[in-house]
Each structure stands twice: as C-alpha cells, then as structure tokens.
Amino acid sequence: MTQFKKTITTIFWVGEGATEENKYIHNRSSYWDDNWMKHYGGVDSPLNRKGWLPAAFTPKQNPFYVALPFAEVDGDGNLKEIAKKIPGFGQNAGPLTRNRWVEIRYKGKSCFAQWQDVGPNGEDDFDWVFGSAKKPKNKWGLKAGLDISPATAQYLSIVDSDTTEWRFVDEKDVPDGPWKAIITRS
C-alpha cells in the first residue's frame, strides 16, 4: 500500500456529456476503451440510482471506479519511458494502471474502486500519481486530482466535490464490500 494523498475530488461518470463544467470532455469513451459506455452497459448517471447501481440497468463493469491523471501509454499506444518507473513494472503482461485498486477515504470512511479512466484534465502527471508531488498539476476549475464514480461518491456521501484522501492498494488487500460485486478485468 502507498501513502494517502489529499486532493480535491470531483464526480464523473460513464456516458457523461461534454459540458463547460467538465472542460467539454465526454465520457462515452475512456482513455483505454473507445466503447466504454457500451462495454459498461449504458450511462452511469448519478441520478435515478438503485442502490449503488444505475436504476435502468446492471453494469457489466465495476460501478466503483476512478480516474487519475496519468496514462502509461501515449496517444499512439506506445509505452511512455517514465512508465517504467511505475511500481510493479515488468512483473506481469497486463496494464500497469487500468483496473488497479484505489482506496478513497472521506471523513474516516473508506471506499475501494478500480482505476478506469485518465483525468481529471491531464494524462501526464506521473509525480502526482506515483511520485512525491503534494498536489496535482491540474490548474483548471477546482484543480482536482481525482475523479470518482457516482457509486463511489454515494458510498462516501459526497454530493458534488470535496477533499478526499486516496492511495493504491493491492487487490489482495481490498476488503469485501459492494465494490467487489462486479470486478472489471478487461
């Protein structure tokens, strides 16, 4: 497990439309999946929920997900040189970042989620995500360093945006909870 980092945290979701509020970035696709909304099963709106899930459908992927502002590959799919510094590099053939587990803590309560997208508003903030930077590079809007899904926000009772703490955890250390009902392996 890594040390907790404190940051402004905002809510985003699969299928979120592009608006001024999110710098005109739509979330029908993710950094790794051009068909994220289809593979997820639909729009994961924070409205009309049934428990931790959207009321209209059961997701095909984990509804507890986050975005962090680093991608190990560039836009052409080539491994970035700095990605070789990611803890665990070379230990397996899978992605270094996608599906990785994150613990988010808010007012003494923890929630666990899988890393499913890159952001908020950046893909090259290695020092924030894996290094010793105390805050993210993001200078836009609230200067958030973490985006969380509606299920994650709901579990933690975060209504819009707030300050949370986060850290990476190994899958074997993730406790049972609603975040383990559907685990994303793609």
Please annotate each region the language model reported.
Residues M1-S186:
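Secreted/periplasmic proteins
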